[in-house]
Amino acid sequence: MPSQKWSTKFQVAGYGGLENMKHMVVKHFPENIERFVEPFGGLGRITDLVKADEYFINDKSDYAYNFLKNKFPNYVVENMDYIDFLKEYATPNSFVFCDPPWRKNIYKNHERPAFTEKNVITYYEKLLELLPKLHCEWIITSDRDEHENGHRLQKSGYPNITMERKTGTGKFFGRNPAVRLCSNIWRNQNDWG
């Protein structure tokens, strides 16, 4: 039986942190994107805001996959393991946006999780290992303090920024919506958009 906990339903439906932060997040994307590659497409909320020459979107959930196919009929939409998807579609002229699962409760409290890794930490470890080998530009997201992924982004050696939306959205889990971004795009603070 699916969880009846409000916080878990909220996480499965889409954590409001990224949903309410998306306009701030895309300001940190490269200006000219040839290939936009999104291995954790969800419902395409970020994709809606991206201008690119080509789009490649993936989600392992059957619901999200079908939703994306209908919403973006002219984009390449896949239902693959995220690693296989990245190896197939990420090229040196790609910008890869990764928003992997942030919360452990999704695993514990969701009836049929459409996840390919045993836990949240593994997503971050594998992404940080693979993305540099693909020679593309990328951003990975997480919750602001990374308490559930063991601070993998902060420890990665790549620049991190944390953004918080202070007005107009209400609180999520008792705090303002916020997101951490980690990327190979930024060299110094002046590059942070």
Enumerate the predicted regions with their spans.
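Class I S-adenosyl-L-methionine-dependent methyltransferase catalytic core
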Residues: 1-193
